[in-house]
Amino acid sequence: MKWREIAITTRQENADAMAEIFEAVGAMGMVIEDPQLIASYIESNVWDLHDVEIPDVPEGMIRVKTYLAIDNTLEERLAALQEELSARERSEKWPAHAWTMTDLHEDDWAHAWKAFFKPEKVGRRVVIRPTWEEYVPKEDDLVISIDPGMAFGTGTHPTTVMCIRALEDYVHAEAHVLDVGTGSGVLSIAAALLGAKRVLAVDNDPVAVATAQENVILNQVDEIVEVRRNDLLSGLSEQADILVANIIADVIIRLAPQAAALLAPEGIMIASGIIQNRLDDVVAAMTEKGFSIEELISHGEWAAIVARRAGVSAEG
């Protein structure tokens, strides 16, 4: 199959909205090229300068890429994408978007991003290692070997890093964990390696489900982690001690009532993928459903929330 890669330069704070737009037109996945994030990795010696190319975009901007199958619906979806972006430019005063488009074979798409993915210690103990890179573990390291394929999530994006660090703080030996929108499965694998008794990982994307399952088996946690195709929390009844969702603000807001119902009393919800200017909206939605905010975590333009479900009252 051939794919049309669409690369668009936009403001950093528009990343959340761009994900919604791409999903609405049926695009497959999103890649964010953030020069500030890449530069911070280089400065911290996570990557060598020669390993990556820093995107040439104006300050405060990022490049986002998505992929549309080249088929008989392509022109219709490109027109819908253009219409949605034009509407945002008019109503929300977004700057005009510069587009580039490139045609790719699936093999090109599946391998082009690998130059950007290097081993990285993302928490106090958790290390993410791509399967094609060597890494010598240090004492107490928990190494996740991962091949994210075409699914969302390598484990090194700030939104995922904040989730992993929160999991390090809250996972305990008897914990049942629910990972909503699992992508590559990295958060579920981290929870299992940190000692969770059971993890249920769900995603509505069949490519993500297949990739997550492969990564779970690769890391030998398939007796702990079950990967299932599911539309968010729809139809789930299994109670969890910890629910982790690294998605986007509007989806987290929609999840709040179901999350409150599925979490055990005093259960923990870790929500990430929230752009800073939507943080107050998510906090309000969660507190309205009875959550108390334990922690607010920030990393650049991104935020994460750790919240606790209310316990059972003495009368209940």
Swiss-Prot record:
Q: What is its main location?
A: cytoplasm
GO MF terms listed in the record are: protein-lysine N-methyltransferase activity
In its keyword annotation, does this UniProt entry include Acyltransferase?
no
According to the record, the segments passing through the membrane are none
Does the keyword field hold Methyltransferase?
A: yes
Q: Where in the cell is it found?
A: Cytoplasm
**Catalysed reactions, semicolon-separated:** L-lysyl-[protein] + 3 S-adenosyl-L-methionine = N(6),N(6),N(6)-trimethyl-L-lysyl-[protein] + 3 S-adenosyl-L-homocysteine + 3 H(+)
Q: Could you tell me the keywords of this UniProt record?
A: Cytoplasm, Methyltransferase, S-adenosyl-L-methionine, Transferase
GO terms for biological process? methylation
What EC numbers are recorded for this enzyme? 2.1.1.-
Residues involved in S-adenosyl-L-methionine binding: 160, 181, 203, 246
Main EC class the enzyme belongs to: transferase
Q: Which Gene3D superfamilies match?
A: Vaccinia Virus protein VP39
Q: Name one GO cellular component term.
A: cytoplasm
The function of this protein is: Methylates ribosomal protein L11.
**Family assignment from sequence similarity:** Belongs to the methyltransferase superfamily. PrmA family.
What's the name of the protein? Ribosomal protein L11 methyltransferase
Source organism (scientific name): Heliobacterium modesticaldum (strain ATCC 51547 / Ice1)
